[in-house]
């Protein structure tokens, strides 16, 4: 069996107000190829945008890969590497029996992982890490897109 291609992904989410207009950004690197993705929502939260960055990046992969995914969100990293197992056992409820927040996004992220071998990494945000800074800029650009869409819709 051949080895899976290795892809490195950097993600970030941002929100102007929480909730408020938000954006997400992702950088996918495969060998010497690089792809940037971003998007936004008119009314969202920072955690939702952090999740959307990871979901969108993983869903963009066209075949199974080994993925090193870097996020500055402890919420995403801890949620997907730890908390999610208990949530699934408890019918998507927290330890104190409350519904998991952002459950649709967590379920979508869980589904996006199935085809891949993902190693999750945390990187300190706003600490000069070039790819994280670029993902942050893409996320902020996503906020601008969301605001423009809002103006067009009004």
Curated annotation (Swiss-Prot):
Pfam families xref list: RNase_H
The entry's keywords: Cytoplasm, Endonuclease, Hydrolase, Magnesium, Metal-binding, Nuclease
Cofactor dependency: Mg(2+)
Cofactor notes: Binds 1 Mg(2+) ion per subunit. May bind a second metal ion at a regulatory site, or after substrate binding.
A molecular function GO annotation: magnesium ion binding
Record: residues binding Mg(2+) 1: 12, 50, 72
Any GO CC annotation of this UniProt entry: cytoplasm
Keyword presence, Thylakoid: no
Positions annotated to bind Mg(2+) 2: 12, 136
RNase H type-1 domain: residues covered: 3-144
GO-annotated biological processes: DNA replication, removal of RNA primer
Coiled-coil zones: none
Catalytic activity: Endonucleolytic cleavage to 5'-phosphomonoester
InterPro entries recorded: RNase_H (IPR050092), RNaseH-like_sf (IPR012337), RNaseH_domain (IPR002156), RNaseH_sf (IPR036397), RNaseHI (IPR022892)
Keyword Magnesium: yes
SUPFAM superfamilies associated with the record: Ribonuclease H-like
Subcellular location: Cytoplasm
Organism domain of life: Bacteria
Major place of residence: cytoplasm
PANTHER family reported for this sequence: RIBONUCLEASE H1
Job description of the protein: Endonuclease that specifically degrades the RNA of RNA-DNA hybrids.
Protein family membership: Belongs to the RNase H family.
Subunit and partners: Monomer.
Protein name per UniProt: Ribonuclease H
Gene this chain is encoded by: rnhA
